[in-house]
Amino acid sequence: MAGDLHTHSTCSDGSVPIHRLPLMAARLGLSALALSDHDTTLSAQYAYDHPVQDGVRLIPAAELTGYDFQRSHRVHLLTFWPDLDCPALRRHCDIMRQRRNECALQSCREIEALYPQFRTEQALEYAQDSGVLFKSGIMQALQQLGLCDGIYTGLYHELFGWEPRGKCLHSPTYPPVREVLATAKAAGAVVVFAHPTVYKSMPLLRELVAEGAIDGIEAVSYTHLRAHETRED
């Protein structure tokens, strides 16, 4: 069975509407696809409602974000087959939606000052499916204005980069990673540590493995392979 267990749609920071992903997967010869958008139950709900589409088995998932305060790094946890009625999961998603939007709107105000032709309303068009304005949506609006030729370009790093820090970067406060783990477990999810080298999380990963706190590790992903190639950890 060939599948992709880590995907994003316009339910978070992806660029393709969720209903189009299964056909794209089928054309690639995949038979399974996990819909795992950031800190939302929207994609998991879609997968529960459409267990098979275009011949592809859809796996309900969510990628939850936490923070390793000991090492000052974000952590992404893929959670498969979560109980969407879990109060802790819903609370996590609600909090992250509010915090992300607050940060994104602050970034937009600063970008409006830098580029007078840009308007926040243009970027908000890309948040219609998710209810959350992500940096990718802001970049798509800037691309429409001819200010860049893609999402993850030089302008993205100038505005939102980490090292050096982008001039318009505002990051939400993330819950502690162990709190997020507890949320995932409360939802009955299978928990997989996503791309551990991307945010330099190998020390934390070793701790969690030793504790038996996670069910798996994402060993292959595009961002993971790039991080490995550039020896970020």
Where are these regions (language model features)?
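Histidine-centered catalytic micro-motifs
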Residues: 2-12, 194-196
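Short, acidic/polar
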Residues: 14-24, 199-207
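Divalent metal-dependent hydrolysis catalytic cores, especially in the metallo-beta-lactamase
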Residues: 22-42, 57-63
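Metal-dependent catalytic neighborhoods of phosphoester/phosphodiester hydrolases
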Residues: 42-51
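Extended substrate/RNA-proximal surfaces in nucleic-acid metabolism proteins
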Residues: 52-207
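Glycine-enriched alpha-helix->loop->beta-strand junction motifs that scaffold or abut catalytic
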Residues: 211-216
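Conserved small/polar residues in nucleotide/adenosyl-binding loops
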Residues: 223-230
